[in-house]
Amino acid sequence: MSAVIFALLLVATALGLERYSTVHSLDDVQGRLEVEDHLVEAGEPAVIHLVVRNSGPRWKMFLAAKLHLNKEFLPCAEHHITQDQTGWGHTVRFTTWLRPGQEADFSTALRLERRGRYVLEPMQVIGGDFLGLVEQSRTERGFHELIVPPRECALPELEEMLGGFLGELSVNRYVYEDPILTAGYRPYTSGDPMRSIAWKQSVRGQGLMVKKWDYTTEPRAVVLVHADTKDYDHPEPAELCYSMARTVCRRLEERAVSYRFAANAAFDLLLNAALSGEEWRKPLETPQGYGPEHYRKVLEILGRATGQTVLSCARFCAEYYHPQEQVSCIVVTTEPEEAVRAAVRPLPGIPLLVLTPEMAAETAQTGEAGA
């Protein structure tokens, strides 16, 4: 009789635990998705973390972290990953149990082969009952994205043209005077304009004196990108422009040339929602500078660009390049070179380099003719 009573108590306890664990399996459980770096190179692993934490006072005998990936995300390993039956994606799923206050961190590596912006789906946290028969899930809040910048453009003609442009930029450093930096004073000559006389120094000295300007101490440039995908079925010209722009900026970084970057492109919906009204409908740009952080901003802009322009090429060049600044200019564009030169019009002696996708076509034709 006592054995029967004990068995009944055991069954009642199991049923009670089963009911409690079914209802409260996700109580005090938090899940979060983390991306090690949202800027990832094409073809390189992008590591993401699925973290589950038990902040409650009770053990959690069964927990799982689940993330669905679209077909653009290519897993680097098949561990804990199953392919959808439709073939349109993959599902990452990790299972564990947690003590009170314990946290589990699961990581997986993905690859993205094409330039662009990719949004990760929200992570799901799954809790199970005491007997492992019933599961309930919860979708965690949060927004995560991966930005893939374009690959560099491997064109010998591009490297040759950039080499000539950078050489001319270095020469101009010692040709043009900087109207801001004063190197000293010298006697006034008949060829100097009256406005250049330094009256304060003239009173102290032995006659009229004028300021002696220093030469430009830092080479500067402006990089403008106008890539218009007029034919949606053939985005290759715009993609090539983005690749050439990356190569241009990398060469400027190597030569420690301070540059300002602007891309005439519509950007993703995240930026559209973050900015009110029509203010978002303008090109993104970086301030004058160079260095790792500056270059990283350039790569992110190139990765986010959609290939759809906001301004006409002429208006874009007019608003983002000012000849009076006497800054060298590089324009990467799908427009004809003649139209760009007519829109930019730098002052005499200021270098202007126009790069178009036709360079690649000419290179391919030259290679075929040589073969």
Predicted stretch roles:
Residues 1-7:
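Feature marks short, highly hydrophobic, charge-poor N-terminal signal-anchor/signal peptide-like helices
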Residues 159, 187-371:
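Exposed, interaction-prone extracellular/peripheral surfaces
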